């Protein structure tokens, strides 16, 4: 039996798989987010307790020897820990917006673009560079007390294994300090962000991913591998490894990723290049800030349950009777496929005749257009896999296939945890049939007439977005 652990933003999960990649059992626990005035934080002890809880539940539901385990989790943010991996302060989430003024300044003075040209990382307020700079100005004592600024999975790995020092991997380190060519930190970028005196906080990069034996949570001595983080782990779990092939993650965030061997640091600075376990191979990532969270907000506001979405999507035609949604709901603006810290969502075309069904369809269409924009910018030329919570809605998957104008290889289940196991197996030299492990649950084909309609609507979406970005810059 193999165990994958996925420490997500709102949910912590552990899944068990057999030798053929069949999912045997899943355990999950929600974790909270504290939101106030653009600040988004998480309690590290709550997160770690949730990890122990799901591992305990999984052991009772799928008893048996564990051959090995893989660990993945949310990326970005700043998780300040002491030498034992325990929190110095609450974790600043990747959704945090407190450092938006720093990003605005770096956009204006050229620092933002310089960093992208060096590392392929388009910074956003919730990534480590701006957050560390903000903390250095406003909470220097917290940085003084910390041994390292790590990422979510790194904190969990250190606690589960009892390792004496924190480390990270090349995937998490990719934003914004890692040089994707040398796979080492770029000290010039550290200097540009005013963090040279905090350089020692950057966790050492373990390349390939770190391994150790578990001391708690898993049976003692279980082999455990740390990484990659959730985006590349999902790509592994969906079988996206050939250049040109892509993955769309329809989760809390909306992420488009395309495998590539071409490191192109020209063009509009946006997204990032995620370094993988294979030097010379990257994932061109366009991780938008908000995916299913946008739909969740609309459902909560309208009093509609998730179970009603499929029926409501059938009640109104493509175009939602003229209702349109620009789905940029994050308090920190947008980070891909462009960076606009002050951009906010827009709802237009609403009248007294508009229905809940119109609002729901318009939101799903808007998210679909944002996904198309991300995948186009990432350079998708091959097949497209889709995973994440959004795949639980067959009607939304059909709508997405139409909006994107291409077949969708839908991968259900715990794809991130699956990818973490595959990464661990590769690290330990355990032979698993990756083709069998990554077979799609189903393939959804687009309707030609609706796909043609949405191709035209996508151009309208881009025009409305351009106007919204202009307004955001004036505010």
PLM regions and their residue ranges:
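N-terminal glycine/serine-rich phosphate-binding loop of ATP-dependent small-molecule kinases
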Residues: 1-90, 117, 217-226, 401-408, ...
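A generic structural motif
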Residues: 29-30, 94, 196
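Short beta-strand-loop/turn "lid" adjacent to the catalytic site in phosphate-handling enzymes
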Residues: 60-94, 122-126, 157-179, 204-210
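Short loop/turn motifs at secondary-structure junctions
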Residues: 65, 198-201, 380
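Short alpha-helix plus adjacent loop in nuclease-associated cores
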Residues: 92, 96-109, 422
């Amino acid at each position: 039996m193999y165990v994958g652990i996925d420490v997500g933003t709102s949910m912590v999960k552990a899944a068990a798989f057999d030798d053929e990649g069949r999912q045997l059992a899943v355990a999950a626990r929600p974790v909270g987010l504290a939101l106030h005035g653009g600040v988004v934080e998480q309690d590290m002890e709550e997160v770690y307790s949730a990890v122990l809880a799901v591992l305990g539940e999984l052991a009772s539901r799928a008893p048996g020897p564990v051959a090995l385990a893989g660990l993945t989790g949310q990326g970005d943010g700043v998780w300040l820990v002491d030498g034992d991996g325990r929190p110095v302060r609450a974790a600043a989430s990747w959704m945090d917006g407190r450092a938006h003024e720093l990003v605005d300044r770096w956009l204006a003075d050229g620092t933002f673009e310089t960093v992208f040209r060096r590392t392929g990382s388009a910074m956003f307020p919730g990534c480590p560079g701006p957050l560390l700079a903000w903390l250095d100005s406003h909470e220097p004592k917290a940085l003084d007390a910390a041994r390292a600024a790590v990422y979510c999975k790194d904190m969990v790995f250190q606690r589960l294994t009892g390792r004496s020092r924190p480390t990270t991997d090349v995937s998490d380190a990719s934003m914004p300090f890692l040089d994707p060519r040398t796979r080492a930190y770029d000290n010039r970028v550290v200097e540009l962000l005013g963090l040279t005196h905090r350089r020692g906080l950057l966790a050492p990069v373990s390349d390939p991913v770190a391994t150790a034996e578990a001391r708690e949570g898993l049976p003692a001595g279980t082999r455990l591998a740390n990484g990659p983080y959730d985006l590349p782990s999902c790509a592994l779990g969906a079988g996206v490894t050939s250049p040109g092939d892509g993955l769309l993650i329809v989760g809390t965030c909306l992420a488009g990723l395309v495998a590539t061997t071409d490191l192109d640091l020209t063009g509009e600075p946006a997204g990032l290049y995620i370094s993988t376990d294979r030097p010379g191979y990257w994932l061109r990532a366009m991780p938008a800030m908000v995916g299913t969270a946008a739909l969740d907000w609309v459902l909560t506001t309208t009093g509609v349950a998730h179970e009603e979405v499929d029926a409501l999507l059938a009640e109104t035609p493509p175009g939602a009777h003229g209702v349109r949604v620009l789905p940029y709901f994050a308090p920190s603006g947008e980070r891909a496929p462009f960076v606009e810290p002050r951009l906010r969502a827009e709802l237009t075309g609403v009248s007294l005749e508009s229905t809940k069904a119109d609002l729901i369809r318009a939101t799903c269409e808007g998210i679909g257009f944002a996904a198309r924009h991300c995948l186009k910018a990432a350079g998708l030329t091959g097949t497209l896999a889709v995973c994440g919570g959004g795949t639980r809605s067959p009607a939304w998957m059909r709508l997405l296939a139409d909006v994107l104008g291409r077949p969708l290889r839908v991968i259900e289940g715990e794809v991130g945890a699956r990818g973490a196991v595959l990464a661990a197996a590769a690290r330990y030299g355990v032979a698993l049939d990756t083709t069998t492990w990554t077979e799609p649950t189903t393939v959804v084909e687009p309707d030609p007439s609706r796909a043609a309609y949405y191709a035209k609507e996508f151009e309208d979406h881009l025009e409305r977005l351009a106007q919204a970005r202009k307004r955001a810059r004036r505010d």
